[in-house]
């Protein structure tokens, strides 16, 4: 697990001491959502994956509210009546890339906590590691890791920017693996949590992390910039073949009827269907032949 943490930190450009490991985005965000004060006002995009919505929404019993705005107008919607801004760097259904810099700066200007889900970005899109206060990522997407692997990055200035929240921020599932020296934390008390982000680690599903470490090493060695150029070039080739304008994303979404969906399935193309549109994505292992196969299936 330490090896996977190291390579993830190298890929993202952060200190490994700021990285907590877990099993899922919602699990890693749960302690953060539990730490916000009663009555906290949360702003999310109107189309946001629920792993970055439900952790906040379950606290409505203590006055926490969640409201929405379109992601392309999210920065403009951030005002003094917003306490937390939770958003994805890349939208999973459409591939829309958020204006991370503008959203993060707008949150900082009003003193709001910014929480960015990078599950659909890290691995192909270089993301400023200093943009958001917290960055959370499911590793089974673009990080090519087994399910059950995820990361949460705490900005080094988190405590300075948000002392109230950080004073209440504590693990909700502390166990031996959250100890300062895990193999000396089998029995207790007293409580002896790690002094860095490892205090939020949970006991790992070992086989998942055995698979994650080499995948992260390959991605870190290749670099998100180079991977992104490759991916977006293939995505644009796909769009051009369909007479669609180019994009800035490795994820594309196009209209498709039931017959086209059936042809894609028969051709062995891996894709998703969201709101009546076919979603395809291209990664470092994708080739021009893959683009041609998908286009051929769509056209029939």
Language model features: what each stretch is:
Residues 1-300:
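Pyridoxal 5′-phosphate
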């Amino acid at each position: 697990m330490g090896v996977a943490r190291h390579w993830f930190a190298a890929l993202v450009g952060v200190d490994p001491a700021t990285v907590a490991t877990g099993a899922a985005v919602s699990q890693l965000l749960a302690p953060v959502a539990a730490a916000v004060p009663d009555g906290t006002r949360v702003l999310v995009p109107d189309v946001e994956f629920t792993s970055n919505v439900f952790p906040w929404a379950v606290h409505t019993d203590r006055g926490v509210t969640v409201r929405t705005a379109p992601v392309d107008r999210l920065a403009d919607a951030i005002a003094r009546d917003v306490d937390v801004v939770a958003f994805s760097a890349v939208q999973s259904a459409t591939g829309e890339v958020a204006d991370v810099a503008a959203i993060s700066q707008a949150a900082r200007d009003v003193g709001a906590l910014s929480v960015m889900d990078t599950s659909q970005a890290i691995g192909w899109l270089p993301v400023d590691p200093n943009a958001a206060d917290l960055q959370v990522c499911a590793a089974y997407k673009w990080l090519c890791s087994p399910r059950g692997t995820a990361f949460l990055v705490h900005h080094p200035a988190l405590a300075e920017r948000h002392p109230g929240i950080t004073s209440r921020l504590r693990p909700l599932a502390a166990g031996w693996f959250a100890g300062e020296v895990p193999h000396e934390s089998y029995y207790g008390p007293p409580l002896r949590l790690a002094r860095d982000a490892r205090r939020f680690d949970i006991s790992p599903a070992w086989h998942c992390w055995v698979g994650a470490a080499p995948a992260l090493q390959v991605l870190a060695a290749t670099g998100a910039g180079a991977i992104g150029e490759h991916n977006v070039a293939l995505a644009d080739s796909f769009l051009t073949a369909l007479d669609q304008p180019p994009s800035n994303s490795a994820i594309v979404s196009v209209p498709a009827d039931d017959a086209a969906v059936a042809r894609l399935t028969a051709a062995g193309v891996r894709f998703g269907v969201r709101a009546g549109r076919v979603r395809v994505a291209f990664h470092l292992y994708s080739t021009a032949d893959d683009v041609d196969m998908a286009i051929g299936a769509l056209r029939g």
